[in-house]
A protein has these predicted regions:
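Conserved polar/disulfide-associated segments of primarily extracytoplasmic proteins
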Residues: 55-149, 163
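N-terminal targeting sequences that direct proteins away from the cytosol to non-cytosolic compartments
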Residues: 2-63, 68-70, 131, 138-163
């Protein structure tokens, strides 16, 4: 009888632990956002509240960094020769310099990622419309689920800008 009871307890423990794993993963991907507003170029982008912010003196954008220094991002805007650029040309230029994983490449936007060494991922997104608004996000591979969710939220907020 003790033998059967031990097996039942062991199975119940394993089932409980397995049920908790997806819940932990789901919580890890929950991202809370703050909003960066650029008054010079009149655009806004949501960014994870886990980042601290330091704006560029030029007014072009901002730098973001995690408290532990393992993740960072930059958000910027530029005007100029954007009439000659598209998401496809941005990706083509990036491909010349490194092996990238293209997520999207259209006339008005592109996104791609690549590995920097074994433990770091860099994700880039560019939105082109009357100029370029972009962000670049660098993070440890161990935090991929969280920062992938963060990138999606940042992209969605960036696309809401009219210029």
């Amino acid at each position: 009888m003790k033998h059967i009871l031990k097996k039942v307890i062991a199975i119940a423990t394993v089932v409980t632990m397995l049920a908790a794993v997806p819940a932990m993963d789901a919580q890890a991907a929950v991202v809370k956002y703050a909003t960066y507003t650029n008054t010079r170029f009149t655009y806004t982008v949501k960014y994870p509240t886990t980042f601290q912010r330091a704006d560029y003196g030029s007014g072009d954008g901002t730098k973001l960094f995690s408290k532990d220094g393992k993740a960072k991002a930059t958000i910027w805007n530029s005007y100029g020769k954007t009439g000659k650029r598209s998401g496809k040309t941005v990706v083509a230029t990036a491909k010349k310099n490194r092996k990238i994983n293209v997520k999207k490449a259209t006339k008005t936007e592109c996104s791609y990622s690549y590995k920097m060494g074994k433990n770091t991922i860099q994700y880039c997104y560019v939105f082109i419309k009357n100029g370029e608004i972009a962000f670049q996000l660098t993070y440890p591979t161990a935090s991929k689920k969280y920062y992938s969710a963060a990138a999606k939220g940042m992209m969605a907020s960036l696309k809401k800008n009219k210029s």
